[in-house]
Amino acid sequence: MFYRLTSLLLCGLLFVAAGCAPIQPATPAADSSTTLTVFAAASLTDAFNEIGKNFEAANPGVKVVFNFAGSQQLAQQLGQGAPADVFASANGKQMDVAIDTGRMISGTAHTFVRNRLVVITPKDNPAQLKSLPDLAKSGIKLVFAAKEVPVGQYALDFLDKVVKDGRLGADYKDKVLANVVSNEQDVKAVLAKVALGEADGGIVYTSDITAAAGTKVQRIDIPDKFNTIAAYPIAAVKDSKHLDLANTFTAYIFTPAAQQVLVKYGFIAIK
């Protein structure tokens, strides 16, 4: 009898203890945030990082994740099936490539900002490059983006315009290209090599010379008649898992608030 009462008492105590213990969830609570993946040209890095934070602040529960690279690399990644919600390219050609992959809908991409080219040198300018004719001097080292990269193609267009003008000679383009020692996969790599003094000069966008970068390089402006006004298109990816949110983000890029950020970083606002 004693052992029976003891057993009953022990069972009762265990039951009470179990009832008082906090109930633990079987699994952790799911993360309620939504991640929006934006593929964007490397030249948009600084401006889009700020715009992304502003968009998150205006849309609680949304996290914007960027994939910055050369537009040609991003178009290739889209063609290979990389998950994405938005694509912002530095030219229409790579947007067309993305459309041809079937990931984008033709006619939905629109220009949201513009840019222009500038020649840069290291801050101490060891080669003493002062003007466009100096780019053709023998023995200097230049860094361009690869021709597949929008800014690389724009640089070639600039050289063609100079040759067509005729005043710097029919062989100007050939002389300049003979000085190119490296072709980079995005514009940020060109900027970095020149800023580090690994090259005497290069061609980037004016937007790449932000306050920080401007302390590390000098600029040589390219006259309007030789320059290229680069048009940047943006569109939602057709198979986005968050298509409504992707369209909301692309629409936000056209708002005055977002356009002001782009202008702050050296871009040309759309009119």
Q: Which positions does each model-derived feature cover?
A:
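Bacterial N-terminal signal peptides that target proteins for export
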Residues: 1-9
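Secreted glycan hydrolases and related glycan-binding modules that recognize and/or cleave
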Residues: 3, 14-15, 28-30
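Bacterial N-terminal signal peptides
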Residues: 8-18
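Exported/periplasmic ABC-transporter solute-binding proteins
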Residues: 20-58, 63, 67-68, 72, ...
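Periplasmic-binding protein-like
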Residues: 84-89
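A short, gly/pro- and small-residue-rich
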Residues: 101-108
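Short, glycine-/small- and polar/acidic-enriched structural segments
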Residues: 110, 117
